[in-house]
Amino acid sequence: KTNGITFRRWLLSCNRELASFLSDTIGDGFKKDADKLEKLLEFADDQAVLDRLAEIKSEKKKELAAYVKEAEGVVLNTDSIFDIQVKRLHEYKRQQMNALYIIHKYLEIKGGKKPSTPLTFIFGAKAAPAYVIAQDIIHLLLVLQEIINHDPEVSPYMTLLMVENYNV
C-alpha cells in the first residue's frame, strides 16, 4: 500500500479482465486478502492459465498504446517491456534513480549490448514550481526522451515517453 492506494483498487477498477480471470481461477478471496493470490502458484505450470494471463497482458498493453497514440501522438511497441512510473515527482519516489538506469541502458546499447527485448519507459510527473530539484529531474527526462528517441542506433531498442498531460 502506498499513499492510500492498494493493488485491489487498481486491479478491480483498471483491469477488470484480469480481476475476472483471477476470480474464475482462484476465487474471490484475493479481493479482501492479498495472501490469497498465492493460490496462483498452483497454476505455475498450467499452460492454459499462463496463455490467458499473457493474452490479458497483451490486450492491456495494446489499449495503453492506443491511448498514448491518441493522447500523445506517439506509437509504442507493444512487444517491448513497459516500465511505467506515473506519479507526482519527488526525490524519494525514485524517478531520478530510474533516469540513471535509463542512461545506463542507453550507454550499454551504444556500446553494443543490445537488449533481447526492446524497452519502453513511460513517465508522467509534475512538481511544484518552487521544487527546483524535481523540475530538474523532469528536464532531465525530457532531454533523455529527445536523445533516445532520435538516436537511430538506440531507438529500435529503447523508447522514452514523458507524458505531456499528466493527470493523476
Where do the model's predicted regions map?
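Catalytic cores of carbohydrate-active enzymes across secretory and cytosolic contexts
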Residues: 2-168
